[in-house]
Amino acid sequence: MGYTTYFDGSLKFNKPVEDWLVEYINKFNTTRRMKRDNAKIKELFPDWEKLCFSGNLGEEGEYFIGGLGYYGQGNDGSVLDHNCPAKTQPGLWCQWIIGGDNDELMWDGGEKFYDYVEWLEYMIANFFDPLGYVLNGDITWEGEESDDVGVIHVEDNVVDVEYGVHVHSMSAMDTDAMIKELEKRGYKVTA
């Protein structure tokens, strides 16, 4: 069970992302973000410096992309809480990846992506901005509930969210039907 949200669009980087960062971010995407003990990571994973962001584990192993088991979900000795992310992270899974020609940030297409705006802000603050990468563009979302729609707008790494009507989803409606739908969603429409 859970709640699925669909995304359309991508954010463009100001320059192609270096291969090492693409590899890191896309591995970050495929590992469960669990609260960990940094000392235990260093003890259990001798190559830990290759399994984190620029040799930095961050707080509670937030930058660690190693681990045991499927998608790094195994309960090795470094895991403090399997169902709780590091205190600096918004959730257990980050589903933003770098794609295109290493010049776009986009949804990975997976289901049940929660805290997507918070994850985007986290990635900008922790990975992209410090390395001089700047994102711009729009990504629309549409959740399972009819009123769960909107646009994530990013301009020069500043994230703005517009909740409400996703006009694209109503493009096939005639004017009267669109007005009725908007009023049903609580909007007051005047001509």
Q: In which residue ranges do the predicted regions lie?
A:
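Acidic (Asp/Glu-rich) sequence patches and key acidic residues
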Residues: M1-A172
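Short, low-complexity, charged amphipathic interaction modules
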Residues: S171-A191
